Swiss-Prot record:
The gene is nrdR. This is Transcriptional repressor NrdR. Negatively regulates transcription of bacterial ribonucleotide reductase nrd genes and operons by binding to NrdR-boxes. It comes from Janthinobacterium sp. (strain Marseille) (Minibacterium massiliensis). GO terms for molecular function: ATP binding; DNA binding; zinc ion binding. The keyword Zinc applies.
Amino acid sequence: MKCPFCQHDDTQVLDTRVSEEGDSIRRRRRCTSCDKRFTTYERIELTMPVVVKKNGSRTDFDPKKLQGSLQLALRKRPVSAEAVDAAIHRIEQKLLSSGEREVISGQIGELVMRELQRLDKIAYIRFASVYKSFEDVAEFQDAIAEVGRERKPAK
């Protein structure tokens, strides 16, 4: 590996450790030319599927867009940032584990709705009203009734 200080091509690995999370390897290195030390990290590079929009265009998956959608639905709701991050992580894991190269935007919307249903029922209704393009009060009432049915224990 090239030294970031002097650009020399030869460096020596002094120490190698697995991160606490187990998802990366930390290497402490020393340049054989300038003797300076630096740290590198090795991580698995996974490629998220390409998102196919309603109009047929394709775009790269953007976790920031996902985060923005969740935060907008959860605005002024008592849900922690950690819970939002965990929901984003679960959605990303589902997309990665599908093994698909492409995912239809509607599938992501459905995953977001499931996560919001778990996190906050009000945020779920907010998101569903936009995502499903509610056009009248009856559609809101149906969604609210559906959420209400899920809360009642089975007899």
